[in-house]
UniProtKB/Swiss-Prot annotation:
GO molecular function: aldehyde dehydrogenase (NAD+) activity
Alphabetized Gene3D superfamilies for the sequence: Aldehyde Dehydrogenase, Chain A, domain 1, Aldehyde Dehydrogenase, Chain A, domain 2
Active-site residues (renumbered): E245 (proton acceptor), C279 (nucleophile)
Pfam (any one): Aldedh
Organism of provenance: Staphylococcus aureus (strain Mu50 / ATCC 700699)
Keywords assigned: NAD, Oxidoreductase
Binding residues annotated for NAD(+), in chain numbering: W146, N147, G223, S224, L246, E379
Assembly behavior: Homodimer.
EC number per UniProt: 1.2.1.3
Known catalytic reactions: an aldehyde + NAD(+) + H2O = a carboxylate + NADH + 2 H(+)
Protein name: Putative aldehyde dehydrogenase
GO biological process: aldehyde metabolic process
Length: 475
């Protein structure tokens, strides 16, 4: 049992103002594995005051000083690798190999990318007799999701530290352990008091007062659209800057000249990775009618090889859904797909055989899906694929963009000219060609209802900066 009932405020582990706690459940076993404080407004106020007190001092640190701080964080993060991997497997249910290869590594990559971005980032620019200055925005509130406990937290923290902005972090109450380890890392390497503050709790007790606090100048949130909308409403009262990374319903366009086995393997991975709990999951797979039958045969073969099971067993590729609530939501979407007339091609409702304990879902494929069906329009956040056929490229692009979301898109094929045309035509913040992968120095964010602003690398740093023009500075 992990007992993390203290908050980290102003460089110290302190008792929460609240006597309440939140239990953390291992989704693979349905057992309580720890608890964290259920913080309240008083905790938030104390954390914001600590951050505000150090704001001017931290803002005026040099780039070299902030790079040195990030260097120390990187080294200690690497020292805590096993602790981070174990915590994520416990709280999220991610297979150990995934926790190490993806979750741990992505968190590390963002600290490195922010440090490297500072090598060439210009905080000042001369324009004739005038000067343009970019300076830290001030106290920033960070609210992070449960599906990537280190990635989503590290990318925000790294950018804020690089910019010189102190923060108050509220991690997800479902996966808070990784954030506590990050706090321990920052404490050990000597992050200045007040620069980093951790307040555990739920949205009502911590998220709301953080979003409304008059001394918080910027809110950075990753999560659902409805919650993002509420944060914007609260932040609008005093015109805070807001950065949002929200949901997605990403298209994966398969071209007719593709290697079918390669395409089936790639699209399978994009749906089952992290048990489908990925905002960029390519869950709408668009396939040319002319290769549909061959593609589906290979797709079924690829899905049949996916091993769902105990995240601590060797060979497990897919772990459980995060919670009973989320498991039930995935089941409801699968049933909705059947009700609306989509053809169940693989998987379906219920749990995989032999996995009655834990929130395990069956990887599922629907075919003959109309893009207006619920399963093709709404984010499921589970291992559920919708296969949609198209007749020509224009139709594929039209279907791909027929969504309220625009976080990511994918295309796979051989003809470079066609690949480039599709990539430029998809309305999304990130498009991957032939499984190229996303590097941590590339900007990340969404079009339409997938969010506002950009994260990662120098673009992420800029979210935590204000721009000042000083006329006549060089006269």
């Amino acid at each position: 049992m992990r007992d993390y009932t203290k908050q980290y405020i102003n460089g110290e582990w302190v008792e929460s103002n609240s006597n309440e706690t939140i239990e953390v459940i291992n989704p693979a076993t349905e057992e309580v594995i720890g608890k964290v404080a259920k913080g309240n407004k008083a905790d938030v106020d104390k954390a914001v005051e600590a951050a505000d007190d150090v704001y001017l001092e931290f803002r005026h640190t040099s780039v070299k000083e902030r790079q040195a701080l990030l260097d120390k964080i990187v080294k200690e993060y690497e020292n805590r690798k096993d602790d981070i991997v174990q915590a994520i497997t416990d709280e999220l249910g991610a297979p150990l190999s995934l926790s190490e290869r993806v979750h741990y590594q992505m968190g590390l990559n963002h600290f490195v990318a922010a440090r490297d971005a500072l090598d060439n980032y210009e905080f000042e620019e001369r324009r004739g007799d005038d000067l343009v200055v970019k300076e830290a925005i001030g106290v920033s509130g960070l609210i992070t999701p449960w599906n990537f406990p280190t990635n989503q937290t590290s990318l925000k923290l790294a950018a804020a530290f690089a910019a010189g902005s102190p923060v108050v972090l509220k991690p997800s109450e479902e996966t808070p352990f990784a954030a506590v380890i990050l706090a321990e890392i920052f404490d050990k390497v000597g992050v200045p008091k007040g620069v980093f503050n951790l307040v555990n709790g739920d949205g009502a007790g911590v998220g709301n007062p953080l979003s409304e606090h008059p001394k918080v100048r910027m809110m950075s949130f990753t999560g659902s659209g409805p919650t993002g909308s509420k944060i914007m409403e609260k932040a609008a009262k005093d015109f805070k800057k807001v950065s949002l990374e929200l949901g997605g319903k990403s298209p994966y366009i398969v071209l007719d000249d593709v290697d079918i086995k390669e395409a089936a393997k790639a699209t399978t991975g994009k749906v089952v990775n992290n048990t489908g709990q990925v905002c960029t999951a390519g869950t709408r797979v668009l396939v040319p009618n002319k290769i549909k039958d061959a593609f589906l045969a290979e797709l079924k073969e690829q899905f049949s090889q996916v091993r769902v099971g105990n995240p601590r067993e060797d060979g497990t590729q897919v772990g459980p859904i995060i919670s009973k609530k989320q498991f039930d939501q995935v089941q409801n979407y699968i049933n909705k797909g059947i009700e609306e007339g989509a053809e169940l091609f693989y998987g379906g409702p219920g749990k995989p055989e032999g996995l009655e304990k834990g929130y395990f879902a069956r990887p599922t494929i629907f075919i003959n899906v109309d893009n207006q069906m619920t399963i093709a329009q709404e984010e499921i956040f589970g291992p559920v694929m919708s296969v949609i056929t198209y007749n020509d490229l224009d139709e594929a692009i039209q279907i791909a963009n027929d969504t309220k979301y625009g976080l990511a898109g994918y295309v796979i094929g051989k003809d470079k000219e066609t690949l480039h045309k599709v990539a430029r035509s998809i309305e999304a913040g990130t498009v991957e060609i032939n499984e190229a992968g996303r590097k941590p120095d590339l900007p990340f964010g969404g079009y339409k209802q997938s969010g506002l602003g950009r994260e990662w690398g120098d673009y992420g740093i800029e979210e935590f900066l204000e721009v000042k023009s000083i006329a006549g500075y060089f006269k």
